[in-house]
Amino acid sequence: KMFGHPCATYEAAQTRKFKLGRTETIRSCSLESLAFCQAMQDTNATDAERYEKFQAAVTRHVKNAKEAAEGAGVDRHLFGLKRLIQQGEEPPALFRDPMNAQSGTWILSTSQISSEVFDAWGFGEVTPKGFGVAYAIKNNALTFTIMCLKKVHSASRFTFFLNEAGIELRAMHDRLNQAKSASPKL
């Protein structure tokens, strides 16, 4: 929303169930999440259409998260392959493709701890032009800590757009719930 286009997003999935496992990348940016964001910006889209796209985006995200936690993500595998390239050896075309570099430049790096005891926590951005976003899902609140380089971005501007998106999403759900409760029961 802030930039007007999707960007590479990193969210960590734990792979500790595997010996020496650490993390894998959950690829949050998907065709489904893009379709949802576009629907939210489309003044002609109905709340029902937006909700359908929201559900599709959530379903895709959950699937991606489960696959990453099961070791079926791509980023650590690609990292391993890249590390096998010998000095002086020409990297395969995949690693020379600009899209590969762009998709691994995490403009948005996120992670969460869902606990009532943490009031705030955080980490910095992983690229100079990015944001580090730590969040917690609590019983009655969502908390965010947003970090970025002051010379490049404004954390308060990011916070504005994040808050606006949350308000819009809540309003959409409220309208749908009102319409559902107002409809005649058969």
Explain the meaning of each model-derived region.
Residues 1-186:
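Acyl-CoA-dependent O-acyltransferases
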